Swiss-Prot record:
Lineage summary: Bacteria, Bacillati, Bacillota, Bacilli, Lactobacillales
Protein name (database record): Ribonuclease Y
Record HAMAP family: RNase_Y
InterPro entries in the record: HD/PDEase_dom, HD_domain, HDIG_dom, KH_dom, KH_dom_type_1, KH_dom_type_1_sf, Ribonuclease_Y, RNase_Y_N
Protein family according to the UniProt entry: Belongs to the RNase Y family.
Gene Ontology CC annotation, any one: plasma membrane
Length: 535
């Protein structure tokens, strides 16, 4: 039993040992198999990675080669295109050159043909002139032949008549012929003497005028219609214009002067044909720039102030001019009226300076001729006084000036000089003739007057006069070189519904009465202002 048990135990032990041994071998085999598998997988991975890298290298090489081929092909294409373009441009250039040469040849041929045509025309004219000259000469020769034939007939008849005359009849005939010849000679001598006297008198008159001009030596030239005001800097232009243009509109409406603001640095131009308005505008603009306060109320205040200042200056101008020509006892009212001529031009010539110049010339000429030089200067000074108020009073400046001289009891010679200096009435004194000559001399001096400027000013003045003729018009200003007429009306006389009608009527009258280039803008302004003061 124990043996069986021991045997069984031994068998069990053997089985256990065998199992353990087999298990160990099996585990070892499994681990070996797993290691082999891992190695195989690792090798496969390495091979795949190597294959992928080689494939990438091959792909990159292929792409690089492809890009290289593309670039080479593109460069070749560009080179071919460039060569083709150069060939085409060269061909076009050659064709253009040929066209230019052809055009030049055609131009030269045309010029040559024109010259030939001109030459032919000139030759034709010359031939016509020669033919006309030949015809005239032939006609003259024919006439002379006829005259000679007639003279021969007369001589034959005269000889026949003389042959039949007695001694007394022949003597009477000779005396008559001699008397006729002497009469012709005397008439010729008289004409020569008259011509000599005329030449000597002309020379004396010229000598007197030359002496007068040398002693006066006037340097005044034609005035312009613009004034310039210098600005401290360009920023002032914006302040002058004001918000939405209120300042510049107010300034132009109150002064009647165009304000021109352009690209000229630090300058504003004031343009207008009326020198008084332009001077008021200049003084106002300079005062605004100096004061720095630029707004509609301040503009209105300064315009009114400068109008009063101009009135005072007008009197000063008249007094200074009267003293300059030696007439200090002139009536004060006449001095003030003469002062207004400082702001009046005639054909661009300042009328006050013209009057002073005429006075001095008349004084010099009168002195040379032994006349009253003081009275001549006075008459010359006052000869154009009517121009100071001819825009306010009906009549010519000659008529107005004559009435003023009579009103202020001037010397009758002065009155007649004013009335006759344009030939409206007959001159009654030597002084009147002297002043007329001095007036013509001053006006005809080179640079003294400008016909085109006077025509321009007259057109603007006529434009304003047409507007002022309508009832209810307060004042009017011709602006923009006559391209616009701006009309201010009395608000109590012209209502809003009448403004358009007034503009239409003014436009119609301008079209019927004036000749002008382009268009004229008619602007009617009705302003109703209410002012009160809080106390």
């Amino acid at each position: 039993m124990e043996m069986i048990f021991a045997l069984v135990f031994a068998v069990i032990i053997g089985l256990v040992i065998g199992y353990v041994s087999i298990s160990a071998r099996m585990k070892s085999s499994k681990e070996a198999a797993e290691l082999t598998l891992l190695n195989a997988e690792q090798e496969a991975t390495n091979l795949r990675g190597q294959a992928e890298r080689e494939a990438d290298i091959i792909l990159k090489d292929a792409k690089r080669e492809t890009n290289s081929l593309k670039k080479e092909a593109l460069l070749e294409a560009k080179e071919e295109a460039r060569k083709y373009r150069e060939e085409v441009e060269a061909e076009f250039k050659s064709e253009r050159q040929e066209l230019k040469q052809t055009e030049s040849r055609l131009t030269e041929r045309a010029a040559s043909l024109d010259r030939k045509d001109d030459n032919l025309t000139n030759k034709e004219k010359l031939l016509e002139q020669k033919e006309q000259s030949l015809s005239d000469k032939t006609k003259y020769i024919d006439e002379r032949e006829e005259q000679l034939a007639e003279l021969e007939k007369q001589k034959e008849a005269e000889l026949e008549r003389v042959a039949s005359l007695s001694q007394n009849e022949a003597r009477d005939l000779i005396l008559a012929q001699t008397e006729e010849k002497l009469t012709k000679e005397i008439a010729m001598r008289i004409r020569e003497a008259e011509q000599e006297v005329k030449e000597r008198s002309d020379k004396m008159a010229k000598d007197i005028l030359v002496q007068a001009m040398q002693r006066i030596a006037g340097d005044y030239v034609a005035e312009q219609t613009n004034s310039t005001v210098h600005l401290p800097d360009d920023t002032m232009k914006g302040r002058i214009i004001g918000r939405e243009g209120r300042n510049i509109r107010t300034f132009e409406s109150l002064t009647g002067i165009d304000v021109i603001i352009d690209d000229t640095p630090d300058v504003v131009t004031l343009s207008g044909f009326d020198p008084v308005r332009r001077e008021i505008a200049r003084m106002t603009m300079e005062a605004l720039l100096k004061d720095g306060r630029i707004h509609p109320a301040r503009i209105e205040e300064l315009v009114e102030k400068n109008r009063l200042e101009i009135d005072n200056r007008i009197r000063e101008y008249g007094e200074a001019a009267a003293y300059e020509i030696g007439a200090p006892n002139l009536h004060p009212d006449l001095m003030k009226i003469m002062g207004r001529l400082q702001f009046r031009t005639s054909y661009g010539q300042n009328v006050l300076r013209h009057s002073i110049e005429v006075a001095k010339l008349a004084g010099v000429i009168a002195g040379e001729l032994g006349e009253n030089a003081t009275l001549a200067r006075r008459a010359g000074f006052l000869h154009d006084i009517g121009k100071a108020i001819d825009r306010e009073v009906e009549g010519s400046h000659v008529e107005i000036g004559t009435e003023l001289a009579r009103k202020y009891k001037e010397n009758p010679i002065v009155v007649n000089t004013i009335a006759s200096h344009h030939g409206d009435v007959e001159a009654e004194s030597v002084i009147a003739v002297i002043v007329a000559a001095a007036d013509a001399l001053s006006a005809a001096r080179p640079g003294a007057r400008s016909e085109s400027l006077e025509s321009y000013i007259k057109r603007l003045h006529d434009l304003e006069e047409i507007a002022n003729e309508f009832d209810g018009v307060k004042t009017s200003f011709a602006l923009q070189a006559g391209r616009e007429i701006r009309i201010m009306v009395h608000p109590e006389k012209i209502k809003d519904d009448k403004v358009t009608i007034l503009a239409h009527d003014v436009r119609e009258k301008i079209e019927n009465n004036l000749e002008y280039p382009g268009n004229i803008k008619v602007t009617v302004i009705r302003e109703l202002r209410a002012v009160d003061y809080a106390k």
